[in-house]
Regions:
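A conserved catalytic-core segment of Leloir-type glycosyltransferases
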Residues: 2-20, 26-37, 75-140
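Acceptor-binding helix/loop patch of EC 2.4 sugar-transfer enzymes
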Residues: 102-127, 167-212
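Carbohydrate-associated surface elements
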Residues: 227, 249
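Conserved donor-binding/catalytic core segment of Leloir-type glycosyltransferases
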Residues: 261-288
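Nucleotide-activated donor-binding/catalytic signature segment of Leloir-type glycosyltransferases, i.e.
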Residues: 311-333
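Aromatic "clamp/platform" in nucleotide-sugar-dependent glycosyltransferases that forms part
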Residues: 350
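Short hydrophobic beta-strand element within catalytic cores of glycosyltransferases
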Residues: 367-370
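Conserved acidic donor-binding segment of nucleotide-sugar-dependent glycosyltransferases
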Residues: 382-383, 388-395, 404-409
Length: 456
């Protein structure tokens, strides 16, 4: 038997041995609504609270909706979200095929209990991503069995056929799409070489055809920036009158300067929720390699680069292992304290539909260097007043902007203070909840969506 085949069989057996059925957490009943408020079914196909912004959005938005008097029950697939008291929770069973420490695992036979399980697994075997499809089918069945318990469904970026079915069946429905995932696909393909890798990248993003098809049928879509609104209209074909803008927020009582935290000279910080080209870590690392020639600096990366991936390989190639530290799994307060130690925070993304890391750093009064990719200029504000903006994918521009801030303590303090004030005035979860609730009211009363919220 060829060694490669023996190795494949051994790895498959090991995966089977490690596989265990998903243990569902207990359902948590939501607090009842106040008079005149809505009963909301909030859907998120994966609620991971530590990786990406979707779990953060879910936790803070649902908490503030409950504070407004609404009753909110979150339906989530694994990994499960962190939710606050008063927010209901119903787990939606899934195979969790990408979980740590066994991503792309082969489930045990006992885990296959429905057609959705089989579909999700077969899509993965075909190099695709089947979670949105399978989750939408599962949650559609669950909601149909509970018709009459909810006034409105709020789906967060699943856009599978089950969501379209809910809309066809007459459920009042609001869709949140943070930015067009077509951009992720384009950037991923631009940074992929080799026929096989390009093929598998296209296969992975195969769910986009489904999402675009579903999205065009939905009557109301909320997005988080004016740039995303324009791009969703242009790239995904959603009419502008079906789109409105409600920005995300930050808890500025947690993300704030802490008097006991001491600045570390030359400390830089970047937060990257995923190890993908769109986050711009490679151009930043190239800039760091140039900056270290003349300066004593170090970089904290909040995130977990893939072993052997593009970011890890770049750190090794540029000899940056002694000044780059990666940290993951921190709490919000720990993250805020890490920001407080930094002299400069960087958001080097090639594109962002909004950017939680930008407003988290600004709320901590840390001066931000960000690119002009996507909505970042909307979020950060005028370059030179509330932050510094540079072209995306430009290491030399990053060197100049970071160096300018490191050399000018007065400018750091000025931009940090103005940035925090901008966030407090514009980007809070209370503002997000009020804007979202206004969308619910418009949908339930048959009115057009509210006007997009201004960032100025």
């Amino acid at each position: 038997m060829p060694r490669s085949l023996r190795q494949t069989i051994a790895e498959t057996r090991a995966s089977w041995a490690r596989s265990r059925a998903i243990t569902l957490p207990e359902r948590v009943a939501p607090a009842p609504p106040a008079p005149g408020k809505s009963r909301v079914a909030f859907l998120i196909y994966r609620g991971n609270p530590r990786c990406g912004g979707q779990g953060v959005y879910t936790r803070h938005l649902t908490r503030e909706l409950v504070a407004l008097g609404h009753s909110v029950e979150v339906f989530s697939g694994p990994p499960w979200p962190e939710l606050d008291d008063g927010v209901g929770f119903t787990p939606v069973r899934g195979l969790d095929l990408y979980r740590d420490p066994d991503p792309f695992r082969i489930p045990a036979r006992r885990e296959f209990t429905s057609r959705e399980d089989v579909s999700e697994f077969l899509i993965m075997l075909g190099a695709g991503f089947g979670e949105p499809y399978a989750f939408s089918r599962r949650v559609h069945k669950m909601l149909r069995a509970r018709r009459g318990e909810f006034d409105i469904v709020h789906d967060n970026q699943c856009m599978g056929p089950g969501i379209a079915a809910l809309a066809r069946e007459g459920w009042p429905l609001l869709e949140t799409l943070h930015h067009p995932i077509t951009v992720d696909r384009s950037i991923a393909l631009d940074h992929t070489t080799g026929a096989w890798k390009r093929f598998t990248t296209r296969r992975w993003f195969g769910f986009l055809r489904m999402q675009v098809r579903v999205l065009r049928t939905l009557p109301a879509v909320l997005t988080v920036s004016h740039n995303s609104k324009v791009d969703i209209n242009a790239q995904m074909g959603v009419p502008l009158e079906r789109l409105t803008v409600v920005p995300v927020g930050v808890d500025h009582e947690v993300f704030r300067p802490y008097p006991d935290v001491v600045k570390r000279p030359g400390r830089l910080m970047v937060t990257s929720s995923s190890d993908v080209p769109m986050k711009g870590l490679v151009p930043l690392l190239e800039a760091i390699a140039k900056l270290r020639v003349e300066r004593e600096i170090d970089l904290i990366v909040i995130g977990r680069p893939r072993p052997g991936g593009r970011v890890a390989s770049t750190i090794e190639r540029l000899g940056l292992g002694d000044i780059v530290t990666t940290i993951s799994g921190v709490s919000d307060e720990e993250l805020a304290r890490l920001y407080g130690e930094a002299e400069v925070a960087i958001v080097p993304s090639l594109y962002e539909g909004f950017s939680l890391p930008a407003i988290e750093a600004m709320a901590c009064a840390v001066p931000v260097v960000a690119t002009t990719g996507g909505a970042l200029p909307e979020v950060v504000g005028v370059s030179g007043e509330t932050g510094l903006l540079v072209a995306p994918n430009d290491p030399e521009a990053l060197v100049a902007a970071i160096g300018r801030l490191l050399d000018d303590a007065a400018l750091r303090a000025e931009l940090g203070a103005r940035g925090r004030q901008r966030v407090i005035e514009r980007f809070t979860w209370q503002v997000t909840a009020r804007g979202t609730a206004a969308c619910y009211d418009s949908i339930l009363q048959g009115r057009p969506l509210p006007a997009s919220m201004s960032f100025d």
